[in-house]
From Swiss-Prot:
Cellular localisation: Cell inner membrane
Name recorded for this polypeptide: Potassium-transporting ATPase KdpC subunit
Function according to Swiss-Prot or TrEMBL: Part of the high-affinity ATP-driven potassium transport (or Kdp) system, which catalyzes the hydrolysis of ATP coupled with the electrogenic transport of potassium into the cytoplasm. This subunit acts as a catalytic chaperone that increases the ATP-binding affinity of the ATP-hydrolyzing subunit KdpB by the formation of a transient KdpB/KdpC/ATP ternary complex.
Record-annotated membrane-spanning stretches: 7-27
InterPro entries linked: KdpC
Source organism per UniProt: Paraburkholderia xenovorans (strain LB400)
């Protein structure tokens, strides 16, 4: 009986060391060496201070900033610990109220409402934390942001164009604009 347990214990210790220590250590070292930025959360800095991550949206509701998608993590917007979809179906009155509330906020901020509102400005994403909007949603807000910052709309459009990322590998997903990066660039533009 003793001979039966010894190989099991040795196998357990070896596999635990391989899968619990060696493999995670090698993968961590590889990630830090090859994908340092991504392995550390894709953090963005301004003036030497971390202001956010490229991967998680932030709440912007002042007229001088581009607004991202609605957050589905209430009562604390963009709370990564509470990430989940809103689970509001198209017939749910709460979804309609949420959309109407965002449209009212866009109106109150002085957005030109003569054009159709891009859907990603009035709905939340699947995770509720999406940091990006479509180029159409960014273009929809250019006049408001330019007016609030006393900038030429063409200058703001050029900034949006510079921060628009195309499809991944040319085929995956859609073009998108990272709201935090764009707003940080706007703040830098104001300083410069």
């Amino acid at each position: 009986m003793k001979n039966l347990f010894r190989p099991l214990i040795v196998l357990f210790v070896v596999l635990a060391a391989l899968t619990g220590l060696a493999y995670p250590a090698v993968m961590t070292a590889f990630g830090q060496a090859v994908f340092h930025d991504q392995a550390n959360g894709s953090m963005l800095e301004q003036d030497g201070k971390v202001v956010g991550s490229k991967l998680i949206g932030q709440q912007f509701d002042a007229p001088q900033y581009f607004w991202g998608r609605l957050s589905a993590t209430s009562p604390m917007p963009y709370n990564a610990q509470g990430s989940s979809g809103s689970n509001l179906g198209p017939t749910n009155p709460a979804l309609l109220d949420e959309i109407k509330g965002r449209i009212d906020a866009l109106k109150a901020a002085g957005t030109d409402m003569s054009k159709p509102v891009p859907v990603d400005l009035v709905t939340s994403s699947g995770s509720g934390l999406d940091p990006e909007i479509s180029p159409a949603a960014a273009a929809y807000q250019i006049e408001r942001v330019a007016r609030a910052r006393k900038l030429a709309p063409n200058d703001v459009q050029a900034l949006v164009d510079r921060y628009t990322s195309g499809r991944q590998f040319g085929i995956l997903g859609e073009a998108r604009v990272n709201v935090l990066q764009l707003n940080l660039a706007l703040d830098e533009m104001k300083r410069g």
